[in-house]
Amino acid sequence: MVAAKKTKKTHESINSRLALVMKSGKFTLGYKTVLESLRSNKGKLIIIANNCPPLRKSEIEYYAMLAKVGVHHYNGNNVDLGTACGKYFRVCCLSIIDAGDSDIIKSIPGDH
């Protein structure tokens, strides 16, 4: 029961940090733009929803590994990730280019 509370707390903190990035930082939403940001070495952190298709997920992880960028697997589906971003559409993956006022890049250890 304590573990569930801890995951909920971290989930909420990730959501609040994401909201801060959306307000003050630079980011790209979507598969194609995430790959573009990785190819041009602009992305600092990649966040992927847990229902992202396996082939797409592995391709993003591969590009992130080449660019030495952290990948965070978001604990929620693409609808949840879209809501956390403050959007009214689904978001499968997003790339944080500039965190702005948020400390999301330091706080989330990328799963290398």
From Swiss-Prot:
Keywords, comma-separated and alphabetical: Ribonucleoprotein, Ribosomal protein
Pfam families: Ribosomal_L7Ae
InterPro entries (UniProt xref): Ribosomal_eL30-like (IPR039109), Ribosomal_eL30-like_sf (IPR029064), Ribosomal_eL30_CS (IPR022991), Ribosomal_eL8/eL30/eS12/Gad45 (IPR004038)
UniProt-recorded Gene Ontology molecular function terms: RNA binding
Cellular component terms per the entry's GO annotation: ribonucleoprotein complex; ribosome
Recorded family membership: Belongs to the eukaryotic ribosomal protein eL30 family.
PANTHER family in UniProt: RIBOSOMAL PROTEIN L30
Name by which UniProt lists this protein: Large ribosomal subunit protein eL30
